[in-house]
Regions:
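Sec-dependent signal peptide recognition
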Residues: 1-3
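Mobile, glycine-rich extracellular loop/lid and propeptide segments
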Residues: 27, 34, 119-121, 133-135, ...
């Protein structure tokens, strides 16, 4: 009887039921969690890492924006809260740490439970519907510490789409051809703007095409403009830079 009671307590400890479970603490994940909570739903936000905000708090502090007036709702609210931090009405360029604190404030104000450092391990379905997911500790995975999460609605807000893929739903990867939806800027595009200000010679020996291409320049022939493919955007490191002499630290060359 004692053993059965211990197993029951352990099972309850590692099982949680909510209205909405959101996988991925990206900016979209945080806002989705906050919105659901403000609508009166019980919410669990699962983040595989230790930080909230995704790219917004991970180094992408320069917002790609054309017409700011198309930004509304909680996105606009976010940028105005950023602005408030800097003593302005709104702010589109910011420090990642400031963005993360704003996202933390959203989950705190929304009373959203956040499960950090847990990644997807298994998806259980009832027919075509997800009934439960199992997550494991990202830093020290062990079946003993796995957690079962049951929810009426699951939302995948991760960048990789792991929950989506494990659930077996249809999806596509890459960029579609212009012809698929009768659009203009899909697929292969020759960059007419956003180029380096200073020309970079592509050859190992500048000006000598026989010397080969420098690292990162592809030998592939460019396909016609608008052609679709299965390629995804490159993964990059993003860092904060400054032109303020009082805020500078040297960028040192690695030993290798």
């Amino acid at each position: 009887a004692i053993i059965s009671l211990m197993l029951l307590v352990s099972c309850k400890k590692n099982t949680e039921s909510v209205d909405v479970c959101i996988y991925g603490g990206t900016s979209a994940g945080v806002i989705a969690a906050y919105t659901a909570s403000m609508e009166g739903k019980t919410v669990l936000l699962v983040e595989p890492g230790r930080h909230l905000g995704g790219m917004t708090s991970g180094g992408l502090g320069y917002t790609d924006i054309g017409n700011k007036f198309v930004v509304t709702g909680l996105a606009r609210d976010f940028y105005r809260r950023i602005g408030n931090h800097y003593g302005k009405f709104e702010q589109w360029i910011f420090e990642p740490s400031v963005a993360e604190n704003i996202f933390k404030d959203y989950v705190e104000r929304g009373n959203v439970e956040v499960l950090y450092s847990h990644r997807l391990n298994e998806v259980k379905k009832d027919g075509a519907r997800i009934s439960e997911i199992v997550v494991e500790n990202s830093e020290n995975p062990s079946p003993k510490t796995n957690k079962q999460i049951r929810a009426k609605v699951f939302i995948d807000c991760s960048y990789e789409g792991d929950l989506m893929a494990h659930a077996g739903v249809s999806y596509t990867v890459g960029r579609e051809d212009n012809s698929v939806y009768g659009e203009t800027y899909n697929g292969v595009q020759m960059m007419r703007g956003h180029q380096f200000w200073d020309p970079i010679d592509p050859y190992v020996v500048p000006g000598d095409s026989t010397s080969g291409l420098i690292w990162g320049v592809s030998h592939d022939v460019l396909q016609p403009i608008g052609t679709g493919d299965k390629k995804i955007q490159a993964y990059n490191f993003r860092v904060c830079l400054t032109d303020d002499p009082n805020n500078m630290i040297p960028i040192t060359r690695p030993d290798n």
